[in-house]
Regions:
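Chalcogenol-based redox active-site neighborhoods
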Residues: 2, 12-96, 103-105, 110-112, ...
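C-terminal cap of thioredoxin/glutaredoxin-like
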Residues: 3-6, 18-30, 36, 103, ...
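Active-site beta-to-alpha loop of glycosyltransferases that engages the nucleotide-sugar donor
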Residues: 9
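Short Asp/Glu-rich motifs
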Residues: 44-46, 97-98, 161-162, 199
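A C-terminal junction/extension of Radical SAM enzymes
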Residues: 96-97, 239
């Protein structure tokens, strides 16, 4: 099974949805290839000096009570997934460089290292309340997950000239976002299972388990049947078709 999903480190439901997905796979005793694609909820957000969640919700027109309710809903969903959320104090910051660093890490250290870094980025944003647009923060967080911070620093400092690795990876982030638009993705998280089943939004663990069971059962049936369909067979009671010979 392959699950492709668009995600942003500034999206609380992305962290919750991905965590519940991984928990569901573990509960089912199954594995899947997980491919993350970059998405920016606020591409024009400042690298540093952004506002926390509460005033941003008020600026969107929510009342005081509605903003409190929105924050409480996220915190409770996070707690149910075992995540230490404090959504109200999260500081909005630009995530473009965080996406670039993740792709750099995946290219040089593998997908497991990139997934570990993603988890650290989410935790930093929603629990530690640091600014992911700050290159010093990105280097430190990478170092905490075992990635040489000096390599990350050199990558972030490199000019985005045509043909350079820094430019190629930056273009890959933009390509992910263009693919999202062409696919019809307008919000995250957004999951596509085996290239045909779309899951827009975060599910709880039970919701993931119910859906994944059906897809895995379908995979098992197809694996047993193969691509050839049913042919002519014979059994104890005879053959399904008799071929007359003259």
């Amino acid at each position: 099974m392959k699950i492709t999903f668009w995600s942003d480190f500034a999206c609380p439901w992305c962290w919750i949805g991905e965590t519940n997905l991984e928990a569901a796979l573990k509960s089912l005793g199954r594995t899947a290839e997980l491919e993350m694609k970059a998405y920016e909820l606020a591409p024009n957000a400042p690298r540093m000096g952004g506002e926390t969640t509460f005033p941003r919700l008020l600026a969107r027109g929510l009342s005081w009570e509605e903003a409190e309710g929105r924050i409480k809903e996220v915190d409770e969903a996070g707690a149910a997934a075992g995540l230490p959320f404090a959504y109200g104090d999260a500081i909005q910051s630009n995530t473009f460089d965080a996406h670039r660093v993740r792709k750099f890490v995946e290219a040089h250290f593998g997908r497991d290292a990139a997934e570990k870094l993603s988890e650290r980025f989410f935790r930093a944003y929603f629990s530690d309340h640091v600014e992911l647009g700050n290159p010093e923060v990105l280097c430190r967080l990478a170092g905490e997950t075992g990635i040489p911070s000096g390599q990350v620093r050199a990558f972030l400092d490199a000019p985005l000239d045509t043909g350079t690795e820094a430019r190629i990876i930056a273009d890959a982030v933009r390509e992910d976002e263009m693919t999202a638009r062409s696919t019809g993705v307008t919000s995250v998280p957004f999951f596509i299972i085996n290239g045909k089943y779309s899951v827009p939004g975060a599910l709880d663990q039970a919701g993931w388990e119910d859906g994944l069971k059906q897809v895995f059962e379908e995979e098992d049936r197809e694996r047993q049947r193969g691509p050839f369909g049913a042919g002519v067979t014979c059994g104890p009671d005879g053959c399904s078709i008799d071929f007359d010979r003259e």
